[in-house]
């Protein structure tokens, strides 16, 4: 059973600049083990940047990031971009916080099975036969076992995203990060990806999800965070936030998006 009080992810006072533009203004957020947190916000609110700071795809200019209690060591240099002090630590923690991208990011020259096996074998150094068996089981679990020998170009967008989820799961991560996983999909393919994500949530997976899927955020996530102009404008239990939004900003956001998935 997940420990409900242990933070799986802890962000403190995260600031991020792109040139002279500060897109995150001291954001703090923690996710306990087993929590599913949806991160909502308009385009440009900083939500994807915040998610990418978790595993150092974007390095914060200030603040701290900890994954499963281990803080990532950052070197802040006057007048220059911050950088991780220890790339080995970053790579190790990236294995614990696996990212699923909007654009799938599958290796085009590898089969789906090879894509899922690649990191466990070559990054984690695990046994190839065991990784193959696990990869096949994961493809079965996400409903694309029949596509194991196909290449990404032969799959629909929904199938590619399910393969990307299987690839992330193959790393045996403690935390799953989803950056708008359905935004690149045709509307009729969104449901098959959300079903896999619902199943993962039901298993007690720790998940941080940047999404525009309002129904998913309301019904599946335990907590919702609403970003506006680089700060958290509202956060709380999802059922309460959607039923009784406390801020005008979030109320307007729900009205504009209709409170339903697209």
Swiss-Prot record:
Alphabetically ordered keywords of this record: ATP-binding, Cell inner membrane, Cell membrane, Membrane, Nucleotide-binding, Plasmid, Transport
CDD domains reported in the protein's UniProt record: ABC_HisP_GlnQ
Annotated ATP binding sites: 41-48
Protein localization: Cell inner membrane
InterPro entries: AAA+_ATPase, ABC_ATPase_HisP-typ, ABC_transporter-like_ATP-bd, ABC_transporter-like_CS, MetN_ABC_transporter-like, P-loop_NTPase
Pfam families per UniProt: ABC_tran (PF00005)
Superkingdom, natural source: Bacteria
Chief location of this protein within or outside the cell: membrane
UniProt GO MF annotations: ABC-type amino acid transporter activity; ATP binding; ATP hydrolysis activity
PROSITE patterns: ABC_TRANSPORTER_1, ABC_TRANSPORTER_2
Bilayer disposition of the protein: Peripheral membrane protein
Physiological role: Component of the octopine active transport system probably consisting of four subunits: Q, M, P and T.
Family: Belongs to the ABC transporter superfamily.
Name of the protein in question: Octopine permease ATP-binding protein P
Organism of provenance: Rhizobium radiobacter (Agrobacterium tumefaciens)
